[in-house]
């Protein structure tokens, strides 16, 4: 993504010009009029920290270079009490986790037992992120390939996410559905309709600004998804490198 375009998009988000507060059911039409100003905090994925340091020193490093939080894969392999201790000693937040089973065992899989495995995994992630003091679990809703037709994936993914509603209500945590290169939910209109079909205030979209550049424009998705966006991922991406 060109730096200028990214800055413009980020500025639009920061001023709250397109994202309204996440306060009402998604079936309600949302105004694009400016609302309250939003403050964006910066975090990074734990796997991005390549330095050979102790857990606490990794947290300190992240703090020293100006980030606010760290995102872990979940279910988490590190004991939660160690993460909480490092959080409390450094002030680094643990606002969200990425479920690590949604790709290898998709919520859209034709096999009901595979879907149930990841439903249970996401339920555990919701409990973990609550204990860590966060509020969101990133979930890829489905995968389409030569063995899983689009319509089958859509039906199964929708059914699976709906089965997670009792878990988000029990924990009070959010699920953010993310756009990845999974051949599934390829337009902002479809993403909006998918979220609206679930129609739950704790289930929204974890929008990846970089991923979408493969087949779209971030500003289109931001405008269409609006208050359905719960968190953002950003990365460097070059259409020139992709095409060449």
Annotate each PLM feature:
Residues 180, 210, 218, 235-237:
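Histidine- and/or cysteine-centered catalytic micro-motif in compact active-site loops
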Residues 240-244:
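Short, intrinsically disordered, charge-balanced linker/junction segments flanking boundaries
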Residues 2-130, 200, 204, 214, ...:
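N-terminal pre-domain/capping segments
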Residues 220-223:
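Bacterial c-di-GMP phosphodiesterase catalytic domain signature
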Residues 10-12, 16-22, 34-36, 108-207, ...:
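Active-site acidic/histidine proton-transfer and metal-coordination neighborhood
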């Amino acid at each position: 993504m060109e730096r200028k375009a990214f800055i413009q998009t980020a500025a639009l988000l920061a001023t709250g010009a397109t994202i309204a507060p996440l306060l009402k059911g998604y079936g309600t039409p949302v105004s694009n009029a400016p609302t309250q100003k939003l403050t964006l905090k910066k975090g990074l994925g734990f796997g991005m920290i390549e330095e050979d340091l102790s857990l606490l020193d990794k947290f300190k490093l992240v703090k020293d270079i100006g980030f606010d939080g760290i995102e872990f894969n979940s279910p988490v392999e590190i004991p939660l009490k160690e993460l909480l201790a490092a959080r409390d000693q450094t002030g680094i937040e643990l606002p969200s986790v990425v479920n690590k089973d949604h790709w290898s065992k998709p919520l859209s899989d034709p096999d009901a037992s595979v879907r149930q495995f990841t439903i249970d995994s996401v339920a555990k992630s919701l409990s973990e992120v609550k204990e860590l003091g966060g509020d969101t679990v990133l979930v890829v809703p489905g995968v389409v390939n030569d063995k899983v037709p689009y319509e089958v994936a859509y039906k199964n993914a929708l059914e699976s996410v709906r089965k997670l509603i009792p878990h988000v209500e029990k924990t009070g945590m959010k699920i953010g559905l993310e756009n990845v290169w999974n051949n599934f939910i390829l337009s902002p209109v479809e993403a909006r309709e998918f979220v609206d079909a679930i129609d739950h205030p704790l289930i929204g979209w974890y929008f990846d600004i970089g991923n979408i550049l493969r087949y779209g424009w971030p500003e289109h998705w931001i405008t269409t998804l609006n208050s359905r966006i719960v968190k953002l991922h950003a990365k460097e991406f070059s259409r020139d490198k992709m095409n060449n």
